[in-house]
Amino acid sequence: MKVINSIKYLLKKFKFFYFFVLIGFFSIILELFAYNFFNFLEINKNLSDLLALLIGIFFAFYLNFFYNFEIHKSKFKRALILFFIISCFSWVFQKLVSYYFVVDNISYEATRIITSGSFFIIGYLLHRKFSFRDFKKVGVAFYLDKSLNLMKVFKMIGNNLDFIHIDLVDNSFSKNKVKNDIAILKKIKSQWPEHVIQTHIMSKKPTKWIKEVIEFSDILYIHWEIKENLDVVRKMILSSGKKFGVAITLKTPPKKILKILRKSSNLLILSIDDPGFSGQRFNFKAFDYVEFFNNLNFRSKFRICVDGGVDKNIIKILNADDVVSNSAILGSNNPADEIAKFQATKYNG
């Protein structure tokens, strides 16, 4: 049973890679078929080579973009350009390798398959980092509470998550009496040094907190409803080399945040009724908010993150870039496996 569970976990964990290789294989087959077809039509050899390459590239990109990494359509143009550039550089490099390391009596088709296969892993790493960097990511949320047992949590989830989401809440925003301990954030950064840390400040006066947490944060979410000048706070965050995100609740009128959203790289939608408390149910009103923001004409400029009540059933129909969960992951029998399930879940909306 352990072996079967381990296999299932690996299949979920490396889903992107497996499908990337499979799609890559079929794209090469399609490219070679097109190459021979153009040769049959007696089209110039170099032109046949180029046309076949373009067919293979677009085929691989389309399947990876929509069916493997499942990235929002607003990111299509940027991803296509990067995919094309990386693929062309890879193709040129493979041509040079095949030219200088020619083996007699090996056909063009065999040479193309061997050289491209040799670069699959490198290609995957480059495309995942650049072309398809906007795939849906899964983060686990923690309160900066003194009661947090960080080592226990690390043993449960390891490095399997995509990012860390920190909730810092004070009594100006919520009745939840959290004893915030900034030292925990420093430990979190030390425990997950390679992971992006999102810090969500639930406070009407966030400036005092920003000064304490900004060193250990990569993205800072600030609520639209604060009693300070939000644009001044935004500039303060950006001047420190960090990303600014605007956070809203389901009581926030979505149209009223459009001005500040145009200046933001991230949007956080709290999909629960009473922010500041964990373990709540997902409020389906959040779907209307997600749909509204997904249809904006500047959608490609920001990422949408949804936090609150998200489980493996909700994530299937949630068209967001990032999802945050606490109870559904940490409360499961196998949190690391649950993260892998979240990451492998396809959008079926």
What is each model feature region?
Residues 139-145, 163-177, 192-212, 217-230, ...:
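Catalytic beta/alpha-barrel core
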Residues 136-155:
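N-terminal pre-domain/capping segments
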Residues 157, 166-167, 213, 267-268, ...:
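Conserved, mostly hydrophobic/aromatic
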Residues 186-192, 233-241, 245, 287-298, ...:
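Surface-exposed amphipathic alpha-helices with a cationic face
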Residues 152-157, 205-215, 252-262, 309-323:
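Catalytic cores of alpha/beta
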Residues 224-226, 271-278, 320-339:
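Glycine-rich phosphate-binding active-site loops on the catalytic face of alpha/beta enzymes
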Residues 177-186, 281-290:
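Charged helix-capping and loop-helix junction motifs
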Residues 2-134:
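Interaction-mediating elements
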